[in-house]
């Protein structure tokens, strides 16, 4: 029985707890720099898990919703980190040059685009879908995790996004 419990515990994905300390991590960005969450200690940080091939991510970028949220975050002195956890050979995997081209072509505003090809940080944070958003306050406490807004679903469109309750912006206001 102990062996079965141990086996179960080892296969349960880790995840972070809202209102608890956000775990530190270190990843390489699209320019080859090593970036750690702790580099931004004292600042609010937004984490965006992304996959450019995801239709929901595409809609948020195509409509400008993600970019306007990034601008709002910057205007409120938050650091925006975009994380790609796609492994080589899987949907959404990109090399540095393509990640930088996507940032430019989508007119996005992340401070860094980070690569997590083994998915270790994604597992640590429990990031399961894209876009999956996290807001960490200046003290390092996770204040929000989940969807960018309440406009989800298969049929969401620009009208839905314009009327949506943006959870990331709300978390940044608190």
Residue spans for each PLM region:
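N-proximal helix/coil linker or "cap" segments that precede and/or mark the start of modular domains
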Residues: 8-24
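A short beta-strand-turn-helix
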Residues: 25-45
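Short active-site neighborhood of thiol/selenol oxidoreductases, capturing the structured segment around
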Residues: 38-58, 172
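Structural recognition of the beta-strand scaffold that forms the well-ordered cores
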Residues: 45-48, 79-84, 112-115, 135
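Structural microenvironment flanking redox-active thiols in thiol-disulfide oxidoreductases
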Residues: 58-106, 117-122
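Short, internal strand/loop/helix patches
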Residues: 100-137, 142-143
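Thiol-/selenol-based redox modules, centered on thioredoxin-like
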Residues: 137-174
């Amino acid at each position: 029985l102990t062996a079965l419990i141990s086996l179960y515990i080892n296969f349960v994905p880790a995840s972070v707890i809202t209102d608890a300390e956000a775990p530190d991590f270190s990843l390489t960005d699209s320019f080859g720099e090593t970036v750690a969450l702790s580099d931004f200690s004292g600042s609010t940080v937004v984490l965006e898990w992304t996959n450019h091939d995801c239709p929901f991510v595409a809609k948020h970028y195509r409509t400008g919703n993600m970019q306007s949220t990034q601008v709002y975050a910057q205007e409120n002195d938050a650091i925006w980190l975009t994380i790609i956890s796609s492994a080589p050979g899987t949907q959404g995997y990109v090399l540095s040059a393509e990640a930088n081209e996507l940032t430019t072509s989508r007119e996005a505003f992340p401070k860094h685009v980070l690569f997590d090809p083994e998915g270790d940080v994604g597992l640590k944070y429990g990031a399961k879908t894209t876009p999956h958003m996290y807001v960490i306050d200046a003290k390092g406490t996770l204040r929000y995790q989940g969807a960018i807004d309440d406009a989800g679903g298969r049929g969401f469109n620009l009208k839905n996004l314009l009327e949506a309750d943006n959870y990331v912006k709300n978390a940044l206001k608190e």
